[in-house]
Amino acid sequence: MQLQFKGTNYELTPEVTDQVTKKFDRVKKYLGTREDNAHAYIDMGKVTEAHVSGNVWYADCNLKVAGKQYYAKAEAVSLRNAVDKMVGELGREIRSAQAKEKSLLRKKGSLLKDFFRFGR
């Protein structure tokens, strides 16, 4: 998986990028063999320079895997919390899409089976 980082209103440090890379191991396990051709574009930073308290930090990610695109965004009090929320949301998006694909495959298989059993 290729990760590209961008910082908005914030200077990214190597510690932050290492932390995000470790967090993305949770996402990699859902991708399986499709992990090799996955590209993640991650944007992290402060909402505005003027905000001092509240949900000041945000993290969003566009993940492109095998022609499909997944998007997750989160805002939180700290950058670490925003990254945690974003990775969790991205994992839910991927699992949901995989469940839909599996359901459609089963439905199509059932229809095909019924079609071939019609003549009996």
Regions found by a protein language model. Name each.
Residues 1-120:
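N-terminal, polar/charged subdomain of small-to-medium soluble alpha/beta proteins
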